[in-house]
């Protein structure tokens, strides 16, 4: 199962809410929206390359909602420090996310919830976010609302 549109929207909204002061200063909101779209698009391309054969593989959790939500949070953290220039971004980010290929075993579907214990999905997404960011050397921006 891939992520539901509402789940994806909630993660993007969380990012926008966290960066709102910067976003509202943009004079061309359409261009700003295109910029964020490009960031997410390029991040997902880089993530696909970094995950390799685990991407869209039913035997792994790399493209399940819990991990995709965590990856969008990593995307927001990475974009804060390395969104520009857009040229070469996929290659830069693929290199940055390449340690994720070493995480493939942890993201096998079998035993996944035991390897990432949590009280619920909100806590599990936060944990996976921290683990993926740490593996890629990306600083996690803490937010007041952690959900």
Question: Can you say where each PLM-predicted feature lies in the sequence?
Answer:
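Accessory terminal alpha-helical modules
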Residues: 1-147
């Amino acid at each position: 199962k891939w992520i539901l549109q509402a789940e994806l929207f909630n993660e993007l909204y969380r990012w926008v809410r966290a960066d709102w002061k910067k976003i509202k200063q943009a004079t061309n909101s359409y261009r700003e929206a295109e910029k964020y779209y490009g960031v997410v698009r390029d991040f997902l391309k880089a993530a696909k390359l970094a995950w390799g054969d685990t991407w869209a593989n039913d035997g792994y959790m790399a493209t399940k909602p819990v991990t995709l939500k965590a990856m969008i949070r990593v995307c927001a953290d990475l974009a804060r420090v390395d969104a520009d220039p857009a040229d070469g971004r996929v290659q830069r980010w693929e290199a940055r996310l390449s340690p994720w290929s070493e995480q493939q075993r942890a993201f096998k579907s079998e035993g996944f919830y035991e390897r990432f214990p949590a009280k619920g999905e909100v806590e599990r997404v936060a944990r996976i976010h921290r683990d993926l960011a740490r593996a890629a050397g990306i600083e996690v921006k803490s937010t007041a609302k952690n959900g």
